[in-house]
Each structure stands twice: as structure tokens, then as C-alpha cells.
Amino acid sequence: MEHVDKHAVKAFLLSLQDQICQSLESQDKSAAFEQDEWQREQGGGGRSRVLRQGSVFEQAGVNFSHVFGTKMPASATAHRPELAGRSFEAMGVSLVIHPNNPYIPTSHANVRFFIAEKEGEAPVWWFGGGFDLTPFYPFEEDCQHWHNTAKYLCAPFGDDIYEQHKVWCDKYFFLPHRNETRGVGGLFFDDLNEWGFEKSFAYTQAVGNGFIDGYLPIVQRRQDTPYGEREREFQLYRRGRYVEFNLVYDRGTLFGLQSGGRTESILMSMPPLARWEYCYEPKAGSAEADLYENYLQPREW
């Protein structure tokens, strides 16, 4: 039977949270993460870290959680009846960054591991995760850098992995009621176990470690770009799409709220400010129109 080292996964996730928080603090320079350790009554807990009102980041949340129980939630066993009667553990790091400057994109990343065990039987396990970018005033070179980072980290795992997980990301982060993508995508994968534990874990580590490589150069390039009220208003309007996606479609948010997760940590992904405007239309030829015309449908980078 293949050895599944869940302790190594947890150690990696805790280290990843530390590394990402340190990188973001070093970039912001004026604000630090506040840590909130919490326990889940049914088993497990986590540590949530939030940086607020920094010079670069309006809000950044980086959450680690490790929850477990003797019985799977009904919402999970409905889709996977083979999990009934098994104890489970779910652990992961999830983060969302909302910058001050509208020229810096919002970003999101997540890596997670799930295992369900029963004495005398092989464990059922899988990895999932990815990262995606949501620009308001997009630059082609930023989007290409983001996707080139993804291509590079995928290459050792197979020639078609980037394309598969890029397409999956485009499909997942899509708002049907708006007929637009949430942003310019990146990578998304779930239920990954067919490679065996070692390779699946190595890929998940590559995705987690690749996030900062993809994101910080964009932040550094755009953080001093001058902007005014018009850009700020548009940023807040587009943040509304983030709220719509997370509350209506995001599986992690819905699962967390339905399974008695910690609400403050689950909703940490929400922007501190957002706005809606009735029947908004960008002006023809404007930078805002460029986003709608060229960046909110899947494309090759």
C-alpha cells in the first residue's frame, strides 16, 4: 500500500503560509499580519492571518486550516458515496489579496489536501488548488508573466498539464449570470491522485510556491502607478464581481459555510469595500472598455 504522508503535507502548508506572509510584509513595509488561532468544535482548527490598511495592500488574508472528523458531511458523501463511514481530514492554505492601487490586480491562491480513512482499507485522498489573477486595468505583459510562471512550474509534470489546468481555471472562475470570467485565470485542479502521492504532492508544492513568483513582480511593477477617483471607483465596482462569485459559485466558500466552518476565516476573501452600479457600461475606447473587450473571456497567453 502506498505511503500517504499527511504530516509532510501539513508541514509544507504551515511553511507556505509563513513564506507568503513574509513576502507580502516585505513588499508592503508599513503593515504586518495579525494572527488569529482558532479551534473547530467538531475537530481541528487553524490560523488566520490578515494584513489590513497597508501602503500596498488594502487587505490580504492568508488562512491555514486543518479540520477533521469521524464522519463525512452529507454534502460530501452525496457525490462520493465511497466516503460514507470514513473519518476525514482536510487541510489547506487559502489566500486573497486586495491591493490599494487599481493598477495592481487582485489575486487568489489555494492548495489543499483531503484524506478519508477506514481501518483495514486503503485511504481515499486527493490534492487540489491553483491560483488566479483578477486585473482591473490589465497589462498584457503582466498577464503573460503570470501565465508563463504557471507554464514553467507545470512543465516537469507533463507537456499538457498547463493547458489542462488553465482551461479548468477558465471554466471554474466564470460568472454565468455575467457571461464573463472573474479575471485572466491561471491554474485550477481538483481530485488529483492518479499520479500517486509523491508526484501529486510535488505538483501541489510547485503551485503553492509559484504564487509569489507570479504575483510579486506585477505588484512591484504597478504599485507606484498614479491613479485617481475614476480608477478607484472602477476597482470597487469590479470587486463586486469577486463578491458575486464567492457567495454564489465558489465551492470552498459554500462548503465551508454549510459544514460549520469558521465564518470569519471563510469570508476573509471578501474585499473590505465594493460597490454596485445599475446597468454600468464602460465608455467606448476607454481603459475600462479594454478590460471587457479583451480580458474577460478565455484566451491564450
Swiss-Prot record:
Q: Which cofactor does it need?
A: a divalent metal cation
Instruction: Give the pathway.
Output: Porphyrin-containing compound metabolism; protoporphyrin-IX biosynthesis; protoporphyrinogen-IX from coproporphyrinogen-III (O2 route): step 1/1
Per UniProt, the keywords (alphabetical) are:
Cytoplasm, Heme biosynthesis, Metal-binding, Oxidoreductase, Porphyrin biosynthesis
Where do the catalytic residues lie? H108 (proton donor)
Coiled-coil stretches are none
Entry EC no(s): 1.3.3.3
Entry GO CC: cytoplasm
Q: From the UniProt entry, list the residue stretches annotated as the region Important for dimerization.
A: 242-277
| Family of this protein | Belongs to the aerobic coproporphyrinogen-III oxidase family.
UniProt xrefs under PANTHER family: COPROPORPHYRINOGEN III OXIDASE, MITOCHONDRIAL, OXYGEN-DEPENDENT COPROPORPHYRINOGEN-III OXIDASE, MITOCHONDRIAL
| Protein name in the entry | Oxygen-dependent coproporphyrinogen-III oxidase
Organism (species) = Photobacterium profundum (strain SS9)
Source gene? Answer: hemF
